[in-house]
């Protein structure tokens, strides 16, 4: 968490450095931007953001395709925003146990609640495939371009699955379509709810306070990744699965 705090603080500080405004992928972080981060107090080597075996990017997850999260323990605990857990919290709430209204916490592993159609993805690799894509889509209309990108995504995913069947590839345009990156993800589908605060705390201030600083709100919820007990790898939900043990957190 200390590393993540430093990263976030470093990135937020760039708002005051006019020449370095904007958002950048860790894979493609320009040297002037990194130097600006250093001038604001960031002390880690650049490959600790992306590239090193224990880089910060290895602990950050795509949370169910619509949020982000961070792994914070050797037993696979993941912190994300409070609203990112709404689907799971609502699904488990009843009249007798209104977890959205009153919050929830699991006293031990056995009380952690499984969730259908929720997952986390770890970014394993990101590469610039702009030249390859531009060659394929030159002169094509929007529909044909989408078809070509889908085909390329499927082909790259098939190659990635030869390395690990839990891998898949996503191709996305960046910088208003001037760049295309292919990102390889590893997907874990057994994700269980561990803790959430009452909605009155998690949504305190509502949209009035959203995007403001400081905020007086408990904007977080906690989940745990579960894995195959034999491989520590991804697995569909099973009562026999065990908490995931990440190499870094």
Set out the residue ranges of the language-model regions:
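Terminal presequence/propeptide segments associated with secretion/organelle targeting
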Residues: 2, 8, 15-249
């Amino acid at each position: 968490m200390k590393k993540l705090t430093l990263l976030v603080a470093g990135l937020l500080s760039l708002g005051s450095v006019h020449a370095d405004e904007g958002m950048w992928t860790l894979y493609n972080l320009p040297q002037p931007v990194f130097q600006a981060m250093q001038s604001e107090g960031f002390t880690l080597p650049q490959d600790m953001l992306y590239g090193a075996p224990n880089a910060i990017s290895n602990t950050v997850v795509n949370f169910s395709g619509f949020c982000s999260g961070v792994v914070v323990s050797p037993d696979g605990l993941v912190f994300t925003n409070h609203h990112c857990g709404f689907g799971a919290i609502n699904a488990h709430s009843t009249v007798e146990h209104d977890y959205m209204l009153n919050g929830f916490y699991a006293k031990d592993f056995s009380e952690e609640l499984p969730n259908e159609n929720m997952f986390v993805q770890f970014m394993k690799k990101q590469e610039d495939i702009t030249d390859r894509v531009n060659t394929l889509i030159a002169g094509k209309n929007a529909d044909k371009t989408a078809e070509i990108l889908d085909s390329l995504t499927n082909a790259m995913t098939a190659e990635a699955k030869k390395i690990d069947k839990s891998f898949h590839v996503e191709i996305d345009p960046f910088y208003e379509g001037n760049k295309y990156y292919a990102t390889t993800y590893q997907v874990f589908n057994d994700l269980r709810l561990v803790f959430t605060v009452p909605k009155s705390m998690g949504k305190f201030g509502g949209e009035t306070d959203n995007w403001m600083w400081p905020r007086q709100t408990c904007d977080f919820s906690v989940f745990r990744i579960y894995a195959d007990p034999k491989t520590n790898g991804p697995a569909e939900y099973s009562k026999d699965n065990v908490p995931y043990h990440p190499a870094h957190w």
